[in-house]
């Protein structure tokens, strides 16, 4: 099967995607390559590419841009890293396709719904092509909710979570977003009294400051962690469409840790 066959299926869907200006494109390689194995991942790091090389896989579907930054004014270190990654891909005949705009809100299998399902909370039905989901009354403290989430995200190599605000406050309507689309203002206007946000989806000097002033607790998750379930779920979807192809989700397993260091009062010397 040619890579183009898989891309054509993906690009034939998604009325919410602006195909005249989209992130969903081949970023490197040839769409006519014949393949029998495919990797899905959150981002095609060097480690993911090495996995592809070791397993003779020549097509990677990456949710995020594996080339760091798209610009004509690049830091030299990024420019150099891009060229090194491109050389590695070319040497091993690997094509990378970015599937972002389609998969963010693809029903059931996509990023938004897979994240909500992974959290295993009582969510309302999703609406249209919104990036946001909201729970029914979960009646949990912020700390209880955070611990529940920690238990659900362990497969994605995040070992802790950040809470901003009163951890004893009761959550009734939790709002969650999709990846970096975690706008606390939009979730608040839809009735959320606490928000699960990504580290790339909130700013400390704007969203966090406002949430603190308005008693809206925030639970902060890593961007990768909240999107990985959707890229894992893509394997199930594509396997049904192309049963003759082997699809494998490769996790970005670099590890995300929150270390709690208790600092004691300094010892005062007597002179």
Model-derived features with residue positions:
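Active-site catalytic microenvironments in core metabolic enzymes, especially phosphate/sugar-handling
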Residues: 1-260, 264
